[in-house]
A protein has these predicted regions:
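Hydrophobic, small-residue-rich alpha-helical packing segments that form membrane-like cores
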Residues: 173-175, 179-234, 240-244, 250-260
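Short coil/turn linking the two alpha-helices of tandem helical-hairpin repeats
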Residues: 161-162, 168, 209, 231-237, ...
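Elongated scaffold/linker segments in the mid-to-C-terminal portions of large proteins
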Residues: 38-42, 47, 51, 55-61, ...
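Positively charged n-region of N-terminal signal peptides that target proteins for export
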Residues: 1-4
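C-terminal motif of bacterial Sec signal peptides marking the signal peptidase cleavage site
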Residues: 17-18
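Conserved, well-structured interaction surfaces
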Residues: 44-48, 52-57, 87-164, 185-189, ...
Length: 497
């Protein structure tokens, strides 16, 4: 669900609505886009609108609008774990039950809204990329703003092609229906834009924060490139791109060291720590600032003294059992089957719940949280190095073992990992699973590292009642988009048949 009552103060009203509904809404407001982009402040406001869409989204009918909540508000990180083997829903919603049971179709509303979130964010990025370069302003700041837009455009398109395959490519701001692109563009063409955007971002992003947290750094672009390269390499069996992934990941690790304690990653008092290469700032949304993270509402079970803990999602028993119960220190941080109150009383749960985002000392009453969404962090860079080197060498060399052990040793795991190709690959996949619960990784990792047949077997083992299919390595194209395109956008194989 994308609805929940929050206290919200929305700033930059024109810029926010000017980026509104990418596919079928006309820009709103008294100032036309042609007459607006004249000053440095206009450029900054246009760029800030991107961050609004990442968090707030576009909800013209208020907080109960089905569109409420942006790209990273909740469904992004929920879908990637639920359309896999990590989580289940406790909602009565058919939409979420169908995701859990692998019976998803082209009418699924969470998928449709996420698609729209991606493209609405791209719309805002394209406005900046098209309009800001012609503004007479400080060149360094101008380049920085355009680089931010290119960073996020690359991120949105990368997730789109990972989830849906070929998708419409809109490289420029669409100001009329006649200019719109209503057919699917090949992933290969979109990859070229992603590579280009991120290389520009590496050069033109700056480390000095303009306002608030959550701005991408040059290393953020390098880290995202590492993620893109390892995915491209897996799709194309390209040792060259595996090596590029290794090189980019190494370049980031030097500047963003991992924390010593896994639990410290998620403390509200430790937001934007050295391990978070880029994160979504739910506290100061880089416009007027507001709280709105849904982690506690969706993931915490009902607890005495904790407000609005709904427990809409829980972890699977398969995920719980996959941890080293005695030694993996991430387990107690990430999942709980019971909770001990301050008076010593214990509440047991009938299933494991995700607790990692709750800083009970800083936010004892829960509800909407200031916890950051750690979209890209250093532990992933170590695992990318391990994964890529294993593919390059068809087995783990010493450097690959050192990389995976950087993550394992922090978790308290000291046993040796297998170094044969398949054994090490499974070890890396397990580390991704345990390290990034509810961080938007699992489905992406499974579809990158496993064959469709392996994907089906893994899901079926974790969820025996589910009906996974090999075509579930893609999500369905929302029927709304097919209808709006008058069927020039085609459906992915297996869906709607």
């Amino acid at each position: 669900m994308k609805k929940y009552i929050l206290s919200v103060l929305l700033g930059g009203a024109f810029m926010f609505t000017a980026c509104s509904d990418f596919l079928d809404e006309e820009p709103k407001g008294d100032i036309t886009s042609e007459g607006y982009y004249k000053t440095a402040q206009h450029a900054i406001s246009a760029t800030n609108a991107i961050y609004d869409y990442l968090i707030i989204g576009y909800a013209p009918n208020g907080l109960w609008d089905k569109n409420y909540g942006g790209t990273f508000y909740n469904d992004y990180w929920v879908l990637q774990d639920m359309f896999a083997d990590n989580s289940e829903t406790n909602q009565t919603s058919i939409d979420y039950q169908s995701v859990e049971n692998m019976q998803i179709d082209q009418y699924n509303q969470p998928v449709e809204l996420l698609w729209r979130d991606f493209y609405q964010t791209i719309k805002c990025c394209n406005v900046v990329i098209d309009k800001v370069p012609s503004i007479d302003m400080d060149v360094t700041l101008r380049n920085q703003l355009v680089a931010e837009a290119k960073f996020f455009r690359a991120m949105m398109y990368f997730d789109l092609i990972r989830m849906f395959g070929d998708v419409p490519l809109r490289e420029h701001n669409v100001e009329s229906a006649a200019e719109d692109v209503t057919s699917r563009t090949s992933k290969e063409t979109i990859y070229e834009l992603i590579f280009s955007d991120l290389k520009t971002a590496e050069t033109d992003l700056k480390y000095a924060e303009r306002f608030g947290g959550g701005r991408p750094y040059p290393a953020s672009a390098s880290a995202l490139l590492a993620r893109v390269y390892v995915t491209y390499a897996a799709e194309h069996q390209s040792k060259e791109h595996y090596q590029l992934a290794v090189d980019k990941a190494k370049s980031v690790i030097k500047s963003f060291p991992m924390l010593k304690n896994y639990g410290d990653l998620f403390k509200v008092t430790n937001r934007f720590n050295t391990e978070i290469i880029w994160g979504v700032n739910f506290s100061a949304a880089l416009s007027e600032g507001w709280k709105g993270g849904q982690f506690l509402v969706r993931l915490l079970p009902a607890l005495d003294g904790v407000s609005n803990a709904q427990g809409w999602e829980n972890a699977t028993e398969d995920l719980w059992n996959s941890f080293d119960q005695q030694n993996d220190q991430r387990l107690d941080v990430t999942l709980k089957k019971s909770f001990t109150y301050s008076d010593g009383s214990v509440e047991d749960f009938d299933k494991p719940y995700v607790f990692k985002y709750w800083d009970s000392q800083a936010e004892p009453k829960g509800n909407n949280t200031e916890a950051i969404f750690p979209a890209i962090r250093t532990a992933e860079m170590y695992l990318i190095i391990a994964e890529a080197l294993n593919e390059i060498n068809q087995g783990a060399n010493e450097e690959a073992v050192i990389a995976i052990n950087a993550v394992r040793n922090r978790a308290g795991l000291t046993t040796a990992v297998p170094t044969d190709y398949k054994g090490f690959k499974n070890a890396v996949l397990n580390e991704y699973r345990h390290e990034f619960v509810m961080e938007g990784h699992r489905w992406f990792d499974l579809t990158r590292m496993c064959t469709p047949q392996e994907f089906v077997s893994i899901i079926k083992a974790a969820k025996p009642e589910s009906t996974p299919k090999e075509y579930h390595v893609k999500f369905p194209i929302p029927q709304r988009e097919i209808d709006l395109s008058q069927n020039t956008i085609t459906q992915n194989e297996g869906y709607g048949q």
